[in-house]
């Protein structure tokens, strides 16, 4: 039918049908139906629906009023119900993110403002001291903001699921790392010598993922939608098994972003003469030769990838070259692995493959506890942690690592200092005076694992503050200490 004319009719005024005897074409926002020589023009249902959606948010507080205003000036009202709900959810996430950032900077200004007032009070009105306080505050804000911005950019740059391979990941720390990567939305391959152990671990991790997703919010489920876990049996001491693992990873995941050489073994705490030849061979083969073979296999795959990748070798007792009595063989493998790591980092400088170390510290695993004495276990109460705790700290740092030659450590100086200061309170934390375990088995711990993930630790609470808060508070505290020392004269001390 030929278009004779175009008309514009506002749907709000169409309380009754309008009839046109001449053939016409009506705008796309009107619903039309032609019968012989007539066109029936109805009210635009989409615009009516849009108006209804906007009205729904009115009168329900400032938050809903803000959404109402946004909807009124947008085209969200013309979307389908599902599209509309998705857009509104995204809008709420944006508003929430903005509100969080505003709250963080309010905390920054409040925290540093309190220190600022203390500094002015201590300066006694001295203009030079006041200037020093101001410059210290401003410098802290600038440096902290730059640091925070860099961290945000790094996190944004590395956003999205990773493809991760973890050797020795059917128990202990390896399984905890696999679980943490999986629940970060990543695709994970677990390995072990035993195919039965691999199958059991895959089923267990899949069940963990289902339980988390069943109770997660819509945004969390979207984040976990790409998560996947598969497994394959692999003896890292055998080159053919390592090659099979790398080929399997490429087939299942398409590429490898992170490869963690976690497979390791120890045969207890005892003098060298009590180790059998088989014990020595197995320790050296697994800890040193296995890590070298896996590093070579991972580098071969990653060097052919446009995005490259990152390889982590696990540090342990003896990595720094210190003596390790009663674990001489284990310590020598870790020391040798550190030498290998330093060499391979220099070899790969012109490639897109990053080589790093990860140090979990002392973790309550079978590897650590094998052959340990009661005295050892009393020490473990102070500095040891559960695998889940360590994995929760290491994985976020592994996911955003850049460059090469980085060290991702759990036992940082602040954590060591905190452990020493609170050592009295940590007595009997994991073992009693007789060396009997007081902590729950892994299966029991994981029943409440999802709930425990949401609880804030001291370090988690510290990380909620922006970087410029900590830098500013530190710099201002140093200035305040300087002012106090400057204002203290020798005559203030008795006997001088």
UniProtKB/Swiss-Prot annotation:
The active site is at residue 330. It catalyses: 7(1)-hydroxychlorophyllide a + NAD(+) = chlorophyllide b + NADH + H(+); 7(1)-hydroxychlorophyllide a + NADP(+) = chlorophyllide b + NADPH + H(+). Residues 195-224 form a coiled coil. GO terms for biological process: chlorophyll catabolic process; PSII associated light-harvesting complex II catabolic process. Keywords: Chlorophyll catabolism, Chloroplast, Coiled coil, Membrane, NAD, Oxidoreductase, Plastid, Thylakoid, Transit peptide, Transmembrane, Transmembrane helix. Gene3D superfamilies: NAD(P)-binding Rossmann-like Domain. Its EC number is 1.1.1.294. InterPro entries: Chl_b_Red, NAD(P)-bd_dom_sf, SDR_fam. One of its GO terms (cellular component) is chloroplast thylakoid membrane. It comes from the Eukaryota. SUPFAM superfamilies: NAD(P)-binding Rossmann-fold domains. GO terms for molecular function: chlorophyll(ide) b reductase activity. Disruption phenotype: Decrease in chlorophyll b during dark incubation substantially suppressed. Residues 1-43 form a transit peptide. The keyword Cell membrane does not apply. NAD(+) binds at residues 166-190. The chain crosses the membrane at residues 105-125, 132-152, 470-490. Belongs to the short-chain dehydrogenases/reductases (SDR) family. Interacts with NOL to form a complex that acts as a chlorophyll b reductase. Interacts with HCAR, RCCR, SGR1 and the LHCII complex. Part of a SGR1-CCE-LHCII complex, which acts in chlorophyll breakdown. Involved in chlorophyll b degradation. Belongs to the chlorophyll catabolic enzymes (CCEs). This is Probable chlorophyll(ide) b reductase NYC1, chloroplastic. The gene is NYC1.
């Amino acid at each position: 039918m030929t278009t004779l004319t175009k008309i514009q009719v506002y749907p709000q005024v169409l309380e009754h049908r309008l009839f046109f005897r001449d053939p016409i074409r009506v705008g796309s926002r009107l619903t039309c139906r032609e019968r012989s020589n007539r066109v029936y023009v109805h009210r635009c249902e989409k615009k009516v629906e849009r108006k209804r959606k906007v009205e729904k948010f009115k009168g329900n507080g400032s938050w809903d009023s803000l959404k109402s205003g946004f909807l009124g000036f947008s085209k969200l009202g013309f979307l389908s119900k599902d599209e509309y709900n998705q857009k509104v959810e995204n809008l709420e996430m944006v508003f929430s993110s903005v509100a969080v950032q505003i709250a963080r900077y309010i905390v920054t200004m409040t925290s540093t403002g309190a220190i600022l007032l203390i500094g002015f009070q201590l300066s006694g009105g001295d203009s030079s001291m006041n200037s020093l306080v101001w410059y210290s505050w401003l410098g802290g804000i600038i440096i902290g903001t730059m640091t925070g911005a860099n961290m945000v950019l790094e996190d944004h740059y590395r956003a999205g699921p990773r493809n991760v391979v973890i050797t020795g990941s059917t128990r202990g720390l390896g399984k905890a790392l696999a679980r943490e990567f999986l629940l970060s939305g990543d695709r994970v391959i677990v390995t072990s010598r035993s195919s039965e152990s691999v199958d059991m671990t895959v089923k267990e991790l899949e069940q963990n993922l289902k339980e988390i997703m069943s109770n997660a919010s819509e945004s969390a489920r979207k984040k976990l939608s790409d998560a996947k876990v598969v497994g394959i049996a692999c003896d890292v001491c055998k080159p053919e098994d390592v090659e099979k693992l790398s080929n399997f990873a490429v087939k299942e995941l398409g590429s490898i972003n992170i490869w963690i050489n976690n497979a390791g073994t120890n045969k207890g705490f005892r003098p060298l003469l009590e180790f059998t030849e088989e014990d020595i061979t197995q320790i050296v083969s697994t800890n040193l030769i296995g890590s070298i073979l896996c590093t070579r296999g991972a580098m071969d795959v990653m060097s052919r990838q446009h995005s490259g990748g990152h390889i982590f070798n696990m540090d342990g007792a003896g990595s720094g070259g210190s003596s390790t009595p009663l674990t001489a063989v284990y310590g020598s493998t870790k020391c040798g692995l550190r030498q290998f790591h330093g060499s391979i980092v220099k070899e790969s400088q012109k490639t897109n493959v990053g080589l790093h170390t990860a140090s979990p510290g002392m973790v309550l695993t079978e590897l650590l506890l094998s052959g340990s004495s009661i005295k050892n276990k009393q020490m473990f109460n102070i500095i040891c942690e559960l695998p889940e705790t360590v994995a929760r700290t290491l994985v976020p740092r592994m996911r955003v690592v850049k460059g090469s030659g980085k060290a991702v450590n759990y036992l940082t100086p602040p954590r060591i200092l905190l452990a020493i200061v609170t050592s009295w309170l940590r007595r009997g934390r994991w073992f009693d005076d007789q060396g009997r375990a007081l902590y729950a088995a892994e299966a029991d711990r994981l029943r409440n694992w999802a709930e425990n993930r949401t609880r804030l630790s001291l370090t988690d609470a510290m990380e909620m503050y922006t970087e410029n808060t900590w830098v500013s508070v530190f710099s201002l505290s140093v200035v305040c200490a300087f002012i106090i020392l400057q204002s203290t004269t020798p005559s203030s001390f008795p006997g001088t």
